[in-house]
Amino acid sequence: MADLEEQLSDEEKVRIAAKFIIHAPPGEFNEVFNDVRLLLNNDNLLREGAAHAFAQYNLDQFTPVKIEGYEDQVLITEHGDLGNGKFLDPKNRICFKFDHLRKEATDPRPYEAENAIESWRTSVETALRAYVKEHYPNGVCTVYGKKVDGQQTIIACIESHQFQAKNFWNGRWRSEWKFTVTPSTTQVVGILKIQVHYYEDGNVQLVSHKDIQDSLTVSNEVQTAKEFIKIVEAAENEYQTAISENYQTMSDTTFKALRRQLPVTRTKIDWNKILSYKIGKEMQNA
């Protein structure tokens, strides 16, 4: 092991550490960071070399953050990244600094983003917040309106998590939806992601995603937002149901094919009986 450590350069060590951090399960960033910190044993090298991994993790995970003085949380996503550690809160029309390691928001300031489709963004946000409140106990959503490849685009992001470290499991749901504001009809593109980590009696991770495409009739802002939510709700309900059914099928078939519930004799071993036989035999020999 010592020879291997001597062969690894600082750059290689940081690269390996960054991979561990980026792939940390939901709600377990701090645990992975602390373990990597002990392994690397060089705080300056870790902070400087793996800073991009801290940022990438938060962007990928849609990390929610509370801004002091504002009621609703906002998601940290690539769509709100203004550069230099600053992010956009489109609902409150502010920007703020975000510490990717501490996961803290500071220095909120007024910020006027693109307002060409602000009325569309607001309508979608209002409808999406009502939907998230109904379907996600701990859900957070952020809706952006911005120009993408020259087209006015609405981007809606949803995040919901349950961190149950005391019960040895953590999980997160993420979904991202996009459509361009064009006359008559447009294409809705979505991606749904689920990640769950269970580690009480073993170490099992569920990592799943699904791509969605559907057509959306574009009329006025409010009606279009309602139709958009119908697409989102139908797709996410179908995905959740499919995941549940798939795991029931896996429990009934795949898992049984991987491991026998009973040994080859088709009978359970009575360990108490075996123990009593052994004790009885030892007593006879005494």
Swiss-Prot record:
Q: Which GO terms describe its biological process?
A: actin cytoskeleton organization; barbed-end actin filament capping
The keyword RNA-binding is assigned to this record: no
Keywords of this protein's UniProt record, alphabetized? Acetylation, Actin capping, Actin-binding, Phosphoprotein
InterPro entries in the cross-refs = CapZ_alpha (IPR002189), CapZ_alpha/beta (IPR037282), CapZ_alpha/beta_2 (IPR042276), CapZ_alpha_1 (IPR042489), F-actin_cap_asu_CS (IPR017865)
GO MF annotation list: actin filament binding
Top-rank lineage group of the source organism: Eukaryota
Phosphoserine: residues bearing it: 9
Name the GO cellular-component terms: brush border; cortical cytoskeleton; F-actin capping protein complex; membrane
Gene3D superfamilies from the entry? F-actin capping protein, alpha subunit, F-actin capping protein, beta subunit
Positions carrying N-acetylalanine are: 2
State the oligomer form and interacting partners: Component of the F-actin capping complex, composed of a heterodimer of an alpha and a beta subunit. Component of the WASH complex, composed of F-actin-capping protein subunit alpha (CAPZA1, CAPZA2 or CAPZA3), F-actin-capping protein subunit beta (CAPZB), WASHC1, WASHC2, WASHC3, WASHC4 and WASHC5. Interacts with RCSD1/CAPZIP. Directly interacts with CRACD; this interaction decreases binding to actin.
What does the UniProt function comment say about this protein?
A: F-actin-capping proteins bind in a Ca(2+)-independent manner to the fast growing ends of actin filaments (barbed end) thereby blocking the exchange of subunits at these ends. Unlike other capping proteins (such as gelsolin and severin), these proteins do not sever actin filaments.
- Describe the family membership recorded for this protein in Swiss-Prot or TrEMBL: Belongs to the F-actin-capping protein alpha subunit family.
Name by which UniProt lists this protein: F-actin-capping protein subunit alpha-2
